[in-house]
């Protein structure tokens, strides 16, 4: 695994630790992340082949530049599984292990953007969860460019419990669907009240932002959840 990480440098290497016929074996996988120098995404075909060969004991990946400690995005992704993560810095030749223990939620502000792990919908779901509202997650395509070209929000918001607002005044907890460099509505933001929103643009840190002219002109739909009255007193 260390040699694979050195060969991949400056990109992140990734793979799996397998138990095959009673022996541990490292199974290298292709990193299909759009920005492999900053993150990793295991090729699903490689993952499936690994499952056929043996039992998956751990996820392995490298941090070519930073210390081999789990990032916030690593902790979130690891919490979705049940196996430890081994992280190596190939230049320092140092390792760390992260054992997930239940669901991990990063701080809402200043999150690193990682597709399907820490993106605009993840941020919205985590905010609603802190407010006492559990929203379902949706499977995204492997490549965020596919989502930009064919966004899913328009066909999913009703099944998630939201209704379209017509002329109602925006209230805390409303969800805004926006078009950011896309032919459709590919971005979402939570309205916090007082002219502010919480959102996470691609390749930026999550932030509290002013709902100014640019974001307003990008907004295509304004939504309100069916349980908003019970939680925030609006409906």
Question: How should these model regions be labeled?
Answer:
Residues 135-140:
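Surface-exposed patches in mature extracellular/periplasmic domains of secreted proteins
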Residues 141-212:
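...with weaker cross-activation on analogous glycine-rich loops/strands in unrelated enzymes
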Residues 108-114:
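Second-shell loop/turn segments in exported
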Residues 1-58, 64-103:
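Conserved beta-strand-loop surface patch within small alpha/beta domains used
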Residues 114-131:
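Active-site nucleophilic cysteine motif
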